[in-house]
UniProtKB/Swiss-Prot annotation:
It comes from Thermotoga sp. (strain RQ2). GO terms for cellular component: cytoplasm. Large subunit of the glutamine-dependent carbamoyl phosphate synthetase (CPSase). CPSase catalyzes the formation of carbamoyl phosphate from the ammonia moiety of glutamine, carbonate, and phosphate donated by ATP, constituting the first step of 2 biosynthetic pathways, one leading to arginine and/or urea and the other to pyrimidine nucleotides. One of its GO terms (molecular function) is ATP binding. Pathway: Amino-acid biosynthesis; L-arginine biosynthesis; carbamoyl phosphate from bicarbonate: step 1/1; Pyrimidine metabolism; UMP biosynthesis via de novo pathway; (S)-dihydroorotate from bicarbonate: step 1/3. Mn(2+) 1 binds at residues 285, 299. The keyword Ligase applies. This is Carbamoyl phosphate synthase large chain. Mn(2+) 4 binds at residues 828, 830. Mg(2+) 4 binds at residues 828, 830. Mg(2+) 2 binds at residues 299, 301. It comes from the Bacteria.
Length: 1099
């Protein structure tokens, strides 16, 4: 069937901020779909609250809205843009839930908008667990015994009937949020109570347990003519009971017989028919009992998902692109296979290699959280690796994770960790085999299929052989074929990695590169991407004779290094292409736009290690390598690349080193007359205590060479300092600990700056909303700044100019400043793209990363900026021509933009929600408004923490904050809020004439503060940290990964209860001040105003 002519304009809903369970894969699938719909001749409107996405770049659609993803805002956009259709299958759970709500509230009917890609009826059948079960049973498919309940009593009754353990799955939540496994009544009470709160419809499914069964997924696509294909089978290495997002997965499935696979394929076809999926991609999960072969359908997602992104990257079949075209009426036999250019999308992909995905966790960021893996997803990112065999792919995937070696454990600890899986489980399996355990014993404890365990055990046996045959060429070859890195072999042989590399070179042991082409090399690929293998002879990655630039990606998403760096990578690729270079992308992350088959000219799906990168350089011989766009990952290996005479494009490695080394950096600042906070370094506890004594408390402590403020802290006493120094030594072994004088009550600024070596341009000057001491990645920020004087802005421009020139920046850099008593201090400089580059680009309407990339290959900055000139500048700043001064004018948009962060605290009950110098946010949203108050209010709604305009406020404020907080709370009382406060805060409020209800702290009488929160009487909590209340910190003690130190105070109990009950909370005076302004604005009139992003630039 040809495309539908009855629709012209299509609205696509994005997935919002990156959270656990919904990450960069939706930017990748959304971008792909937008390109497909535009090329088919449709007008496209995109709405997303996340500015760090390629899909919100204006070139991919006819209208971009960066607005909160709520029904109210969507209705306004629909009213304004009048789309004919809504495609909700590309924005994850968020978009599906919104589509259901828009339909049920009659909004789609009101404006004549059709749902395409998935009918309302189908979404409900797939998403509503009770309906899904009924539908499957009618289709003759087996599902697990289960019951939907909406209260605790029914849940207890059901669990008694089914027998423990039982699985609890809240309806309509993401990544298993609020769910879990209950082994007894006490656990059931706890999980069900949380699950009923998390579920938007307040129901949970109690399901019989299939712990230990094998889990499989099929990625399927179907068109309107009934054609059905399986794109890829995926096997979870981990058994049922661990969320598939936290499982190690393998494609294609390795342990299914052909008969079992056909049975599963037939069942998948029946599922699609029964649910009524007429067009698009779906993901269907099955569980198989390894003893009896009994197969049950677990669930299906009627949309593109994390697994479909993985399946697309594993096979080269662009599921999202195909699904978008199917949604507008095309059939599979009308859509070309974009990789071969010869076949059609109706051909099932065939693959002659193995793909392994491993999740990346960061539980150390959430002290107090339960590290055990269960049905609630906890990982923040993932890597994918390709090899000719499972062993090779597994080895490559493990080194892509960029993790440190696991702690050495005794057998007792190993057994415990195998039985209770944690993120380190794979290390423990290898440790078990090293300690002499056999396959059967490990299988009993882990329920992982014996085939995988035998493969892993063989690797450990090879290690023993390596120890016996030092420098044997044949055993070296075998180790390389089995996925061992030069570094691992070097460790076993007790030599340097360089020596192993030389031995390989002397014996001509090199990898060859094979192609991912969807058809096992049956047809020639037009848009090739490659993986390395030592199990092959012919090199399929034959380099062209064009001038090439290689861009190093950022590897797996993690806290501190997320989708923002992929955004800058992709913009870099496009810029180099526009300048006539062939682009080579190297990355290991399957969720991203950078690893899409048509982003760069050539894609290498490889680990970002020195060894893997050097091999690609050997094959491609690029003009140079770009390390400035991928965050800390490429910077970490830059030194070794320079040693091997690889040309680094952009800012030189010498400058990178000066910026990373505190002593060298301080010396440079002194030479050019700039200030930094006084600091010292220490290599022992004694030395640290001495340094802190000289600087005076409070001090800021951090290890060198870390990302996202890992193990950073503000310390007030010598006792706390001692505890922290021990932790820092574990995080960054062999490097000294840095100790800074902490600047209290300073304003922190974040500056994104671009330079071509002569001219310097501040692209974004952002003011942090949170107090100094909160990691800039966790603080909301505003552009343009709201509290800087004209004189101060000019001084900042001069300061940044001096520093950028001294560091010889070519391209982009990020500088963090603090202003205290009108003095400017340099906190740090990063000569690379920062996580704020996408936000700045969207706020000012100028593609910062693209301009920076072009500068790296010799373009002139004023000439590049002239395309966007005149842009809005500060009131009173008049510039007729760019380039008259070496300091180019700083953009000063008329609209205010606020970046707010999203932190996954609800995934980790038990973690304290206080903000500090260690970054914990996974994603961000952007609020745009006529003034700061409107932008801040919209950012809070977008982040899922809408501020209330009526109700009661609970206030408990530390003594140090009372002077500033009391007048702000008085404003809220004047606006009609009822104020409850603990004794000390109440006294301070009463002395200002504020009417307040005194509420006892825990232990001072009932009903107390916690009772008040549990009763649902409070709509906002204001609680600041008192100086005698230590934050909880994760401290490593060798054997056990993390233990929590610090006591659980009343403040901690209030914060965690507010989080559990989904009550908005403010933990700093600064956020209270911003909230008061936002609430006042909201009380004056609606802030549900929507504007096209491009219109906000013209104001």
């Amino acid at each position: 069937m040809p495309k539908r002519e009855d629709i012209k304009r299509i609205l696509v809903i994005g997935s919002g901020p990156i959270t656990i369970g919904q990450a960069a894969e939706f930017d990748y699938s959304g971008t792909q779909a937008l390109k497909a719909l535009k090329s088919a001749g449709y007008e496209v409107i995109i709405v997303n609250s996340n500015s760090a996405t390629i899909m919100t770049d204006p070139e991919f659609s006819d209208a971009v809205y960066i607005e909160p993803l709520t029904v109210e805002f969507l209705e306004k956009i629909i009213e304004k843009e009048r789309p004919d259709a809504l495609l909700p299958t590309l924005g994850g759970q968020t978009a599906l839930n919104l589509a259901v709500e828009l339909a049920e509230r009659g909004i789609l009917d009101k404006y004549g908008v059709q749902l395409i890609g998935a009918k309302l009826d189908s979404i409900k059948k797939a998403e509503d667990r009770e309906l899904f079960k009924e539908t499957m049973e009618k289709a003759g498919l087996e599902v697990l015994r289960s019951r939907l309940v909406n209260n605790l009593a029914d849940a207890l009754e059901t669990a008694r009937e089914f027998g423990y353990p039982v699985i609890i799955r809240p309806s309509f939540t993401l990544g298993g949020t609020g769910g879990g496994i209950a082994f007894n009544e006490e656990e059931l009470r706890d999980i069900v109570t949380k699950g009923l709160i998390e579920s938007p419809v307040h129901t949970v499914l109690i399901e019989e347990s299939v712990l230990g069964w094998k889990e499989y997924e099929l990625e399927v696509v179907r068109d309107g003519a009934g054609n059905f294909i399986v794109v890829c089978s995926i096997e979870n290495l981990d058994p049922m009971g661990i969320h598939t997002g936290d499982s190690i997965t393998v494609a294609p499935a390795q342990t299914l017989t052909d008969v079992e696979y056909q049975r599963m394929r037939d069942a998948a076809h029946k599922v699609i028919d029964a649910i009524g999926i007429e067009t698009g991609g779906s993901n269907i999960q099955f569980a198989v009992d390894p003893e009896t072969g009994r197969m049950v359908v677990i669930e299906m997602n009627p949309r593109v998902s994390r697994s479909s992104a993985l399946a697309s990257k594993a096979t080269g079949y662009p599921i999202a692109k195909v699904a978008a075209l199917l949604a507008v009426g095309f059939t599979l036999d009308e859509i070309p296979n974009y990789i071969t250019g010869k076949t059609m999308a109706a051909f099932e992909p065939s693959i002659d290699y193995v793909v392994v995905k491993i999740p990346r966790f960061q539980l150390e960021k959430f002290p107090g959280a339960d590290p055990r893996l269960n049905t609630q997803m906890k990982s923040v990112g993932e890597v994918m690796a390709i090899g000719r065999t499972f062993k090779e792919a597994l080895g490559k995937a493990l080194r892509s994770l960029e993790l440190d070696a696991a702690p050495k454990l005794d057998l007792e600890h190993i057994r415990e960790h195998l039985a209770n899986p944690t993120p380190e489980r794979i290390s423990y399996i290898f440790a078990a085999f090293r300690n002499g355990m056999d396959v059967e014993e490990v299988h009993e404890l882990t329920k992982i299929d014996r085939w995988f365990l035998r493969e892993m055990k063989a690797c450990i046996e090879l290690e023993e052989e390596l120890k016996l045959k030092k420098f044997d060429v044949e055993i070296l070859k075998k180790a390389k074929q089995w996925g061992y890195s030069d570094r691992e072999i070097a460790e076993i042989w007790g030599v340097s990695e360089k020596e192993i590399r030389k031995m390989r070179e002397d014996n001509r042991i090199f990898p060859v590169y094979k192609m991912v082409d969807t058809c096992a090399a049956e047809f020639e690929a037009q848009t090739p991407y490659y993986y390395s293998t030592y199990n092959g002879v012919e090199n399929e990655a034959v380099p062209s004779d064009r001038e090439k630039i290689m861009i190093l990606g950022s590897g797996p998403n993690r806290i501190g290094q997320g989708i923002e760096f992929d955004y800058t990578n992709v913009h870099g690729v496009w810029a180099f292409q526009e300048e006539g270079y062939e682009t080579i992308m190297v990355n290991s992350n399957p969720e991203t736009v950078s690893t899409d088959y048509d982003t760069s000219d050539r894609l290498y799906f490889e680990p970002l290690t020195v060894e893997d990168v050097l091999e690609i350089v050997r094959n491609e011989k690029p003009k140079g390598v770009v390390v400035a766009f991928g965050g800390q990952t490429p910077l970490k290996i830059a030194k070794y690349l320079v040693e091997e005479r690889v040309n680094i494009i952009g800012t030189s490695f010498e400058s990178i080193e000066i910026a990373e080394d505190r002593e060298k950096f301080a010396k440079l600042l002194k030479q050019i007359g700039l200030k930094c906070p006084p600091f010292g370094t220490a290599s022992s506890v004694e030395e640290a205590l001495r340094v802190a004594e000289n600087l005076g408390y409070p001090v800021l402590v951090r290890p060198s060479y870390v990302l996202g403020g890992r193990a950073m802290a503000i310390v007030d006493t010598p006792q706390e300092l001692e505890m922290y120094v021990k932790e820092a030594a574990v995080v960054s072994p062999g490097y000294p600990v840095l100790i800074d004088k902490f600047l209290e009550d300073a304003i922190e600024l974040d500056v994104d700056v671009v330079s071509d070596g002569k001219y310097v341009w501040i692209a974004g000057l952002m003011e942090q909303i949170e107090e100094a001491g909160v990691h800039s990645g966790d603080s909301a920020c505003v552009l343009p700044p709201v509290s800087l004087s004209e004189k101060l802005v000019e001084e900042i421009e001069e300061t940044v100019y001096k520093l950028v020139k001294a560091l010889k920046v070519v391209g982009v850099a990020n500088i963090q400043l603090a202003v205290k008593d009108e003095e400017i201090y340099i906190i740090e400089a990063n000569p690379r793209a920062s996580r704020t580059v996408p936000f700045v680009s969207k706020a000012i309407g100028i593609p910062v990363a693209r301009i920076a990339a072009k500068i790296m290959v010799g373009r002139n900055l004023p000439e590049l900026l002239s395309e966007y000139f005149p842009y809005p500048t500060r009131p009173g700043v008049k510039v007729d021509k760019l380039g008259e001064s070496e300091i180019l004018p700083t953009p000063w948009p008329k609209m205010f933009s606020v970046k707010e962060v999203v932190i996954p605290f609800h995934k980790f009950p038990g973690t304290d929600v206080l903000l500090g110098p260690e970054m914990r946010s996974t994603g961000e949203v952007m609020g745009i408004g006529e003034d700061f108050a409107e932008a801040f209010a919209k950012a809070q709604i977008a982040a899922g923490n809408p501020l209330p305009t009526t109700g009661a406020i609970l206030a408990t404020v530390a003594d140090k904050d009372k002077r500033e907080a009391v007048p702000l709370l008085a404003h809220l009382a004047d606006m009609g809020f009822e104020i409850y406060a603990t004794r000390g805060t109440a006294k301070a409020l009463q002395s200002h004439g504020v009417e307040v209800k005194v509420v006892p702290k825990v232990g001072e009488g009932r009903p107390d503060v916690i009772d008040l929160l549990e009763q649902g009487k409070i709509s906002l909590v204001v609680i600041t940290q008192s100086s005698d209340e230590p934050a909880l910190v994760a401290v490593s003690h060798g054997k056990e990964p993390f233990k929590v130190e610090g006591r659980r105070t009343v403040g901690y109990m209030i914060r965690t209860t507010a989080l559990k009950r989904k009550i908005p909370y403010l933990t700093t005076v600064e956020s209270l001040r911003a909230a008061v302004a936002a609430i006042r604005k909201m009380k004056k009139g609606s802030i549900v105003k929507v504007r096209r992003l491009t219109d906000t630039w013209k104001m």
